[in-house]
């Protein structure tokens, strides 16, 4: 079990511990990409809140102009997070500062919205720009072209692929398509508060080789954390705190005796005396309550 856990942790990115790639000259531009329903808009607010809490001055950008009410949703999320939102039409004002409204001619043109937002961020001294892009129910070329156009227009420092942790086997094909389409630089897992153990994380990390940077673990703005490969490996294996148990066993149980018992068990020669010895070894570990 320990070996499997270690290998899973390695695949998920043990030792990577890569922070966000911040620009030497602000603003740092972060573009979010993913399928519709993956939770990009909500995650944009969480990331903005996390950055604000870390001392940054983020600006959210509503570049999803296709999904009904997507702009309004981001404005509401921005208001809750206390982070201003740049949008192509006037809407809810954020508590994070003055309402940021783009010129009317940008309506319907997500590329221009993104480009103008970056220029405004430079003027108003926002140090981070988070661009929420449109998604689809499935991968298609129109989606990828729009994402590529935005990428080419603003040259983001990070392109974060947002994926639903409950997506299952579709994670592989989706991740491949977005990796080939926009060449994302990192992954964010959303909806980890559900029943999913996070197998999608293993699939995406293995197929793309891109680091998983963050995980969204609930509906609240604060339910957002830096990704920890070791914890995700334990979640996938549904192990709980079994690693501590393994460490205790390694310390207390004699290795030579354990190998002898394993050999007897494999050959079918295990006796009641051997079973007694095993119980005595387990007893050395202390109370079962521990």
What are these regions (language model features)?
Residues 1-14, 18, 25-28, 56-57, ...:
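Non-catalytic, charged/low-complexity accessory segments that flank nucleotide-binding cores
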Residues 1-100, 111-123, 127-131:
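Primarily NTPase-proximal linker/entry elements flanking Walker-type ATP/GTP-binding cores
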Residues 61-63, 164, 281:
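Active-site-adjacent beta-strand anchor residues
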Residues 64-68, 91, 107-108, 165-168, ...:
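Short, surface-exposed acidic/glycine-rich loop or hinge patches that mediate macromolecular interfaces
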Residues 68, 202, 289:
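Glycine-centered loop/turn positions within well-structured domains
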Residues 114-118, 122, 126, 138, ...:
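Conserved phosphate-handling catalytic cores of large alpha/beta enzymes
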Residues 134-136:
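Short glycine-rich anion-binding loops that position phosphate/pyrophosphate groups of nucleotides
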């Amino acid at each position: 079990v320990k070996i499997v856990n270690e290998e899973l942790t390695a695949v998920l990115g043990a030792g990577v511990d890569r922070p966000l790639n911040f620009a030497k000259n602000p603003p740092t531009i972060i573009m979010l990409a993913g399928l519709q329903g993956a939770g990009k808009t909500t995650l944009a607010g969480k990331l903005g809140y996390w950055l604000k809490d870390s001392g940054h001055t983020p600006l959210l950008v509503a570049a999803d102009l296709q999904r009904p009410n997507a702009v309004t949703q981001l404005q509401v999320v921005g208001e809750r997070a206390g982070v201003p939102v740049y949008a192509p039409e006037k809407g809810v004002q954020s508590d994070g500062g003055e309402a940021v409204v783009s010129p009317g001619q940008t309506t319907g043109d997500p590329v221009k919205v993104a480009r103008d937002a970056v220029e405004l961020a430079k003027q108003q001294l926002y140090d981070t720009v988070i661009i929420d892009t449109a998604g689809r129910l499935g991968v298609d070329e129109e989606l990828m072209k729009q994402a590529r156009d935005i990428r080419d227009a603003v040259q983001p420092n990070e392109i974060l692929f947002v994926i639903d942790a409950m997506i299952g086997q579709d994670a592989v094909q989706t991740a491949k398509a977005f990796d080939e389409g926009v060449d994302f630089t990192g992954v964010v897992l959303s909806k980890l508060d559900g029943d999913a153990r996070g197998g999608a994380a293993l699939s995406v990390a293995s197929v793309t080789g891109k680091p998983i940077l963050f995980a969204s673990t609930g509906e609240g703005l604060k339910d957002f954390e830096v990704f920890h490969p070791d914890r995700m490996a334990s979640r996938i294996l549904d192990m709980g705190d079994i690693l501590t148990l393994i460490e205790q066993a390694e310390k207390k149980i004699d290795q030579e005796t354990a190998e002898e018992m394993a050999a007897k068990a494999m050959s079918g020669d295990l006796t009641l005396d051997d079973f007694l010895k095993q119980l005595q070894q387990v007893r050395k570990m202390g109370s079962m309550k521990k």
